[in-house]
Amino acid sequence: MTDVVQDFNELYDRIENKYKLKYTFDCATNSNERMLFCAIQERKSYLCCALNEQLSCVMHKCVPVIFGTRLDKQFRETDDVDANNNINGTFMLDGRFLSFPNIMMNNNVLVHNFYDKLYAKHCKRMFLYGNVDQEKHINRAIQLVYDKQDDVLFARDVYASDYVVTEDLNSVLETYLANSGKWKPLDFLFEYNTLHKQQLVEHIKIIMNHDINYSIDSLANKIVYKHAYLIELLLTSTILQNYQRVLDKTADDDAYTVANKRRKIQSVLYNKESKKIVDCIVNGRLIYCVSKTFSKQRKVFPNQQDNSSNNNIEISLPVLKYRVGNEVARITNDSMRQKMLKQKKDFVKFIGSFFHGEMTVAGKKFFLCRNACLPNVDYEMVAQKFQYLLKHNLVAFVDDLNDVQDDSLLIAFNDRPTNLKCLKSNTSFIVYTMKRNMAPIELKITDRILYVNHHEGMICIKKKLRVNNEADINVLLTPYEYHYKHSIYYNPIIQCTIVENDDVKSLMSKLEQYYYRNFIHLFHTTPVPKLIVSLTNLKNAMPVFEYKEENCVSGLPNGYSVAVNKSILLNNKMFKLWTLVRDNKLMTAEDPYIPHIALPICLYNNKVNKLKGKLVVGPKQSCLVKFTNSSDKNYVALDDGLVLYMAGVLVSNAKINWVYDGRRYKIETCTNGNFNVYKVYVYFRQIKNQKIEKLDASMVVNGDNVMLKIVIVTSTNDLEGIKICGIHGQKGVFNRSEDLTEWMAEDGTHAQICLSPVSFLSRQSNFDKIERKYVVRGGNHDDPHAKRYPIFNIPYMLFNNTPDNIFKEFIKTSHTGHEKVEGTRFDQWTKNQSFVGNRMSESLHWMRGGSNLPQNCGEFNVVSSLLMCNNTIMKN
């Protein structure tokens, strides 16, 4: 679980304090006035400026303002939109809400396995960063490849020139290690004495000699980058490091010369760079800050959409609670796609086990488990821990590699050789010091080396650790520490054990725990395919809100939404209905539900149409445009199932070319003197029991572009044909409604919806731990012979005919979302599922007895081996 708002608040503070900057919404006005939400939505995007003490704009309209952060509170007046829609953690571009997922990639900070035609498969590789060029701000890298079988080290630098590995390489390695440019506070670990400097090649061989006992697809070999970390890298590499150099130079110069050189007030210092940052944010390509390979791939394969595609996720309101900040997206390319779908065993308890996102990108999107977190990088904290160990003599300096005894361990930091060693007997104290206070530091151990790792993109899980069987501390463990048998905590000599107290919740994300709060038992009692149906429909579910008589229409989300009575509201996606398992005249065949004639549910449809046009004017001509919307008596029902809405009249002294297909809109044109008059009509569909709640039209003119925004809000209480899904993953559509008040409980509660008995049995559902009452048909509970039937208070979701819906290939036109779709599909998969599944067991009996012999025939053995996917148990 990561908190995006907290991460960004810390980032804003860090930048402000380090570079002495002040944030303002617009450097041109520099006013402190707070804006309304609608004003931000009308602007291009929600990005702000950062001014220095001379009031020059350092970062010009390129700092993203994340909703819910302190910057957002500084610039915007809070309103009801926040509370109802969970928008915290999202950002806004072009009036759309977006979130950025955590990005998972292979870990190239530590020693790792790799595939390269030049080297054998068993070789291991490490990149040493260092040899920093302050002038050009380049952090060069050298690639070390180690072949364990021949005990040979190969080295090549970024210019692909291979070094011959001789004694001379020691001095090159020292240059890279001593000045990593990545973890400055820890540079004292890499100050070697004269003798040790000559042994660096040997030292690195010892480190790289240990076996990597996890595969390239394991979570132990992954790092996950957070949104805030990538934004910080982008701002720093594009603008802030250049600005820092200017600051350093200014500090060196004399104060008088600075006064003469001072720029004029309100200038923008880095206009081009700021535009580059905005492009990067808009195109969702933050990952290029980390990996140069991706930007190269884009140039080489312009059509390869995978890595160069936009990672921003557009979000429709209201946002699923706890979704933002917990989504993880894998970066894959087409050749890797199939392999990457695998989830290795060490994903368990770190990455949610149930919700694997859409079918189209299966294996690419995940959610973090509730106890998993992505800690921030803090090399200062690690440096303090090493200083503490030195002060208390728990570690000592290495003078000569050959002097290190068998009772000692060399210490490596991020798989780099350091100048420290420790006694094996002190290991548990070192574990206690390093791991306490939930420090995100990974520890590994071999017979010669203690590995201490702390780098960007670590993924950790919160656990309790018992040290020396006496002290319990709360710690953060990495996948390697928690899952692998070679982990330091499964080593009996170290005497550190993990205290376990987990149930099925440890496999779930916070999002799932919130929406399935009182129904967690479903996750270990219901078949997994049904859970996936339930979770996928939760994602596509229509927003649910409490019905209020007054002002129900004002804050509606776009598209369909559901207003329900407060008594049945569960959360912003679910409501409860009393459910009776029964059928009537086969109305529930093929999975429909029979609803009660009067449910406390109202369906709203908020449709926003944007009609665009271009004024035909010369480059410097001005133009008059006026729009009058028709406020009353402005619609008429037509015979063909449509409603015609007269939106209004637009008058202009220039001609307008409208962009429309002539189907949804009708525009009548005429001229009046020098003016062009346009009457705009809009068609929309009639549905049963439709009530027109709001019709509105307004105009925005920007340069020579004209846009009419037309809002149509309708509601209906007729739910026939709408898709519904129960919390158990039983989906269907509403059939014709019936009066269900005859199924009455003693307290006056009656059934509200009927579930198909066949569906209930075949889905292996169970209604354990769900509120139930007993009803009698006719409601006469005094009759002792009257049969009692249970009704269950089950949560339901209504969901849309989404465009990527399975049925789209059969029903080409989904006009209202009320079209019935069950029973339309009869392709190979459906035939196989329904026909073969139900007949297979019968035909097996026939085959088994077909030869009239006591032994099973070969045909029976072959066909019974195909019974993998059916819930069939065979008894001899």
UniProtKB/Swiss-Prot annotation:
Which major enzyme category is it? transferase
Q: Catalysed reaction(s)?
A: RNA(n) + a ribonucleoside 5'-triphosphate = RNA(n+1) + diphosphate
| A cellular-component GO term for this protein | DNA-directed RNA polymerase complex
Asked if the Swiss-Prot or TrEMBL record annotates the protein with the keyword Cell wall biogenesis/degradation, the reply is no
State the function annotated in the UniProt record.
Answer: Component of the viral DNA-dependent RNA polymerase which is composed of four equimolar subunits of LEF-4, LEF-8, LEF-9, and p47. Plays an essential role in late and very late gene expression.
Quaternary structure?
A: Interacts with LEF-4, LEF-9, and p47.
* Record-given protein name: Probable DNA-directed RNA polymerase catalytic subunit
Source organism of this protein record:
Autographa californica nuclear polyhedrosis virus (AcMNPV)
